[in-house]
């Protein structure tokens, strides 16, 4: 069925869903998200997830067929990150986190976690969490103090999940702390996976027992997660995977994930990562030049933590930015002193980069952010800033063809839906499926 016929049938049969679809496409086209966990999915990965492969799961397919695709995806993950083992049949990062916890810990064990990360995934599980974080004044991790805490609390597991830390971590020092107290080390690289995969920032894989990350956002794949681990503890993780019910992942998800991993091994993905870094640094510099304070002295990743001026309510600022057409994440950054939380907007260059924005565009975005964070908007200026963002996004697609593989660069990704991509892929279905996983 052609895309026009399909949309016509959808509109007639379910106008509520049709309207929701059209409104959401319009929202994504006409607004800009700086939220770290929001990014556009690769059109080819989206095609595979919506393909006939959705009709089969690993559990239901013919003998060996499902194992082939899972092993292919596993091998790609291991080769991309230099890991001894990979678990790829996980539906989301929360599920992956519970698998890791169940595999590594016994009830009552102590966990030393950066900003108490992963505690939110422990419902019904009996672990004792201790916190470490950044120094509230220096706004960086004091590894000597982390060592002192670890020696005092003697954790079974140390977690580093720096979703609110824009600096490059000292993984060697963290591994030293872990070895000193005889603990496991688990690092969640989160949205930094693009920078690790592209070799633009250090990888913790060689030093950590477990490394986790979501497969959407910066990897631009389907919603899911991957666990990388040492071969010695692979049986523990695989047992936890089976015991938590991850036995029937659909082949469309695995194929989509396999494509995303294959794309991440290509030079264009490295170029994408380089632009992500260039954009985040340009955004940070442009904000600072306009008097906006940045936590942690700037950025070395995709992340920028922008603090408001004195007296500016961050929630009000976020709502103002939303009306202007810019979506942001309000955060309170924990520190080594529990009573001190650092308020900031957690901004990411991932989605702007995917849409094709460059350093000069970051300057425009910084101008809008700075006016709101400074609490300096004059009457009628909100409309002016809204028009500025609308003009910036006028010719920007949801997923820029700049980041497409050369074979698909001619696909029109700026259309109001992905129909042209599906149509193109349908015409070349046999050749795509034959050559996709070389």
Say what each PLM segment does:
Residues 1-23:
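Charged, compositionally biased N-terminal leader segments and the immediate start
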Residues 24-30, 53-59, 234-239, 258-264, ...:
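Short acidic (Asp/Glu) and glycine-rich catalytic loops that position anionic groups and cofactors
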């Amino acid at each position: 069925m052609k895309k026009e016929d399909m949309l016509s049938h959808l509109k007639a049969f379910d106008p509520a869903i049709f309207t929701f679809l059209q409104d959401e496409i319009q929202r994504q086209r006409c607004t800009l998200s700086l939220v770290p966990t929001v990014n556009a999915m690769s059109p080819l990965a989206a095609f595979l997830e919506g393909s006939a492969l959705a009709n089969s799961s690993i559990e239901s397919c013919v003998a060996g067929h499902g194992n082939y695709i899972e092993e292919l995806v596993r091998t790609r993950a291991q080769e991309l990150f230099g890991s001894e083992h990979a678990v790829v049949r996980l539906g989301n990062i929360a599920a992956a986190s519970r698998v890791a916890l169940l595999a590594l810990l016994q009830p009552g064990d102590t966990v030393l976690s950066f900003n108490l990360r992963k505690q939110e995934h422990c419902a019904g599980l009996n672990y004792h969490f201790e916190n470490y974080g950044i120094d509230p004044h220096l706004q960086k991790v004091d590894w000597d103090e982390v060592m002192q805490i670890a020696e005092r609390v003697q954790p079974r597991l140390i977690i580093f999940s720096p979703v609110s830390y824009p600096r490059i971590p000292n993984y060697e020092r963290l591994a030293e702390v872990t070895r000193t107290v005889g603990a496991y080390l688990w690092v969640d690289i989160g949205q930094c996976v693009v920078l690790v995969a592209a070799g633009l920032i250090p990888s913790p894989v060689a030093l950590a027992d477990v490394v986790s990350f979501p497969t959407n956002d910066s990897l631009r794949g389907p919603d899911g997660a991957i666990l990388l681990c040492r071969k010695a503890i692979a049986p523990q993780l695989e047992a936890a995977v089976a015991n938590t019910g991850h036995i029937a992942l659909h082949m469309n998800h695995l194929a989509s994930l396999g494509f995303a991993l294959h794309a991440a091994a290509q030079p264009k993905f490295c170029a994408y990562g380089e632009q992500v870094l260039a954009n985040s640094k340009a955004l940070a510099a442009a904000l600072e030049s306009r008097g906006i304070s940045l936590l942690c002295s700037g950025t070395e990743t995709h992340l920028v933590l922008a603090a408001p001026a004195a007296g500016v309510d961050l929630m009000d600022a976020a709502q103002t930015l939303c009306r202007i057409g810019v979506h942001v994440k309000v955060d309170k950054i924990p520190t080594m002193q529990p009573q001190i939380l650092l308020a900031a907007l957690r901004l990411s260059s991932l989605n702007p980069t995917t849409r094709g924005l460059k350093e000069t565009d970051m300057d425009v975005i910084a101008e809008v952010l700075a006016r709101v964070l400074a609490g300096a908007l004059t009457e009628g200026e909100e409309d002016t800033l809204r028009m500025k963002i609308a003009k910036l996004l006028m010719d920007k697609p949801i997923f820029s063809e700049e980041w497409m593989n050369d074979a698909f660069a001619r696909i029109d990704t700026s259309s109001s839906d992905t129909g042209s991509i599906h149509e193109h892929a349908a015409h070349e279905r046999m050749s795509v499926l034959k050559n996709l996983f070389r």
